[in-house]
Amino acid sequence: DTRHKIDDVTEEYWNERMNVNLRHYFFTVQSVKKSMIENKGGVIVNIGSSSWMVGQGGMAAYTAAKSGVVGLTRSFARDLGEFNIRVNSVVPGWVLTQRQIDLWLNEESEKDLMKNQCLKERLLPHELAQAVLFFSSEQSGGCTNQSYIVDKGWL
């Protein structure tokens, strides 16, 4: 999620951001589809971002790609449901990985984050992983075509 100004985005940068944040979802599904059909089902869990839902500025290429993840999730769910393949996405808020902390977290940004979240604590990577594990399990057998927000109540 490299920050960038609109005027600084080149076609090369745009394509690279789409490759990193969107393209692989499509081609991964394309490559596993046949074996999932042969196995009479499966589960696909994509990872989106809530940044486009909140209108995050300063990273238009990233937010465009991540909104595309939701579109792909919904299309894949429709196309693959007849083969008993469930497709969902988990849409995290600001997950405070070490990279996020090092690059962008400061006293002001954390104060603003806590002001906007219902749960006044940091969203950590393992919490996102728990949602992915749920959607990967039989406990979510009735869930497909959904994008589940994990953001401590930010949205």
Predicted segments with their positions:
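Substrate-binding pocket helix/loop in short-chain dehydrogenase/reductase
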Residues: 5-6, 10-15, 113
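Active-site loop-to-helix junction immediately N-terminal to the catalytic Tyr of the SDR YXXXK motif
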Residues: 9, 55-63, 75
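C-terminal substrate-recognition "lid" of short-chain dehydrogenase/reductases
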Residues: 26-29, 41, 122-150
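Active-site helix of classical SDR
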Residues: 29, 65, 73
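Alpha-helical segment proximal to the catalytic Tyr-Lys
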Residues: 34, 78-82, 141
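Residue(s) in the substrate-gating loop at a strand-loop-helix junction
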Residues: 49
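Short, flexible catalytic-loop segment of classical short-chain dehydrogenase/reductase
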Residues: 91-102, 155
